[in-house]
């Protein structure tokens, strides 16, 4: 059985096999785990096609990797590779549509894997952000064309375009795979003629073994970990609003945010940078207004090992996003046994049971509810240990590499049997 994958980024395995500069192990992290599990399947011939900045190919551990710059290469590549099935990871990127058309023209079945549900991500992108930060004038759009920033109206336009591409790709889909009640419902609406196959994700191997999280005596200085805060869907603004209630009881509490801090090039350029990065400006002003600026720290970008350590050093993991499907960061935190507090949106309730495996709060923008959930964990006599252990047990089932690989192979076999009875 020969399966061709299309992925939107150059995976670390592909970069190594093709002799390219190292790719980030953050991008496409769910694919690296799934790929590692599938390599052991003796009856599977796997070709992984990545979209990158230069053409390259190579083979490692029995997997053939191809990196292409131009989607015009897809049709001849299919003729050369002659796979039995094309598996497209993601629905909203331009090469997905090109590959789907090329595969159908060659008479090949196409399986789409739903990642985020862009329809809902676009709808909730700027929830809770004041209008004055969401709209930028003509001058700032002109500057943005020369020196790109992060104007929120541009970001909204981009998300809306991704949602439209997702809808177009799924409208003609015959086979889709997902993993939550949320994406299943989305596929029922967006891909009404498709057969839906459930299949969970396999995460980065580093998070399955080694030291687990343990509660510590944090006294007045608990650490709250937010895995991303650079754009409004991740809802940093609501976390900032929740901080005063936490600080009222734990005066030295710290919010750690994985990623780069807001750009600062000194007082002369600061007004321009602030206008070019309005969401960061809003969060900066909000933190200053609430008196919590000194309690917020950015870690800088973290590779897998550093991110693992960040989980272990935290006391509570936060995921207050306005929309998520099956966030890898939540799965990783659960695998390590870290107590989790998350918004009850999208696919999150399919991953974590409220009250036993972590705490979910209803409205993502409800800062009071978020603060109460965080304080409930911090107040618990065991520091959230019991919830963390239950979360780890659940995550070991959800992200079981061998089972997920077997499920995916069964999906391939079922589709091919239907196509060639």
What spans do the regions from the language model cover?
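Membrane-proximal helix-turn-helix segments that form the acceptor-binding/catalytic region
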Residues: 118, 134-175, 189
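Short hydrophobic beta-strand element within catalytic cores of glycosyltransferases
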Residues: 339-342, 352
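Nucleotide-activated donor-binding/catalytic signature segment of Leloir-type glycosyltransferases, i.e.
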Residues: 267-301, 305
């Amino acid at each position: 059985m020969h399966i061709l994958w299309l992925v939107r980024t150059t995976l670390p395995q592909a970069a190594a096999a093709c002799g390219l500069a190292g790719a980030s192990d953050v991008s496409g992290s769910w694919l690296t785990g799934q790929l590692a599990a599938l390599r052991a399947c003796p009856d599977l011939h796997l070709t992984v096609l990545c979209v990158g900045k230069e053409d390259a190919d190579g083979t490692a551990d029995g997997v053939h990797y191809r990196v292409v710059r131009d989607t015009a290469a897809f049709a001849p590549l299919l003729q050369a590779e002659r796979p039995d099935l094309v598996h497209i990871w993601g629905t909203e990127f331009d090469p997905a549509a090109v590959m789907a058309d090329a595969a159908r023209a060659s008479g090949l079945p196409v399986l789409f894997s739903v990642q985020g549900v862009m329809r809902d991500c676009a709808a909730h992108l700027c929830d809770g952000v004041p209008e004055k930060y969401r709209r930028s004038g003509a001058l700032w759009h002109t500057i943005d064309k020369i020196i790109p920033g992060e104007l929120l109206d541009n970001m909204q336009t981009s998300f809306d375009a991704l949602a439209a591409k997702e809808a177009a790709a799924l409208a003609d889909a015959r086979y889709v795979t997902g993993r939550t009640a949320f994406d299943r419902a989305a596929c029922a609406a967006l891909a009404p003629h498709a057969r839906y196959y459930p299949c969970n994700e396999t995460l980065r191997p580093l998070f399955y073994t080694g030291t687990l999280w343990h509660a510590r005596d944090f006294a007045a200085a608990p650490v709250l970990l937010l895995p991303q805060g650079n754009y409004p869907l991740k809802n940093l603004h609501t976390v900032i609003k929740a901080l005063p209630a936490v600080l009222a009881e734990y005066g030295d509490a710290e919010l750690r945010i994985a990623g780069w801090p807001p750009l600062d090039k000194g007082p002369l350029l600061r007004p321009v940078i602030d206008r070019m990065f309005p969401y960061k400006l809003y969060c900066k002003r909000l933190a200053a207004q609430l008196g919590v600026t000194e309690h917020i720290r950015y870690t800088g970008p973290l590779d897998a090992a550093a991110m693992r350590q960040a989980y272990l050093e935290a006391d509570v993991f936060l995921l207050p996003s306005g929309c998520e499907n099956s966030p890898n960061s939540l799965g990783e935190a659960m695998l390590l046994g870290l107590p989790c507090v998350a918004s009850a949106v999208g696919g999150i309730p399919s991953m974590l049971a409220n009250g036993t495996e972590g705490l979910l709060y209803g409205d993502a923008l409800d800062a009071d509810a978020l603060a109460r959930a965080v304080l409930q964990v911090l107040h618990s006599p065991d520091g959230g240990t019991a919830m963390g252990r239950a979360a780890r047990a659940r995550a070991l089932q959800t992200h079981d590499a061998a089972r997920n690989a077997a499920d995916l192979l069964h999906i391939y076999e079922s589709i091919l049997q239907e196509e060639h009875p």
